[in-house]
Amino acid sequence: MSGTIAVAPDKRWSAAGWLFEWAVEALAEDLDDDAAVASLREIVDDNLGWLGLDDLSPAVRAEVLRRIRTELVDRADRELPPTLPNRSEAVDLLRDLSRLAENA
C-alpha cells in the first residue's frame, strides 16, 4: 500500500504506506485546529492513503506547508531508527516532499 499527499493539484508526492502515515501523523501533532487533527488522524486510522492539502482550511494548510518545508526532514533524521531498512531513501523522499512544498 502507498499514500499520496497532494501539495497542490499538480504537485503530488507518493510514498510507501508506512512513510505516508508517519508523515501525516507528524504533521497532525500539535496543530491548533482540533478538526484538522481529527481529519489527519482519520486518514491514518482508516488507511485512506490520501491527503489533499487543498482540503484543509487556509490557515491549517499554511501551517502544514510550513512544517513540511522546515521541520519534517529534520524530524525524520531524529526519529527514524538508524537500523530502518532504506532509511536514507525514506529521508530523501521526505526531502522531495519538502521541495514540492517550497512553491505551493
Question: What kind of region is each of these model predictions?
Answer:
Residues 1-103:
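Acidic (Asp/Glu-rich) sequence patches and key acidic residues
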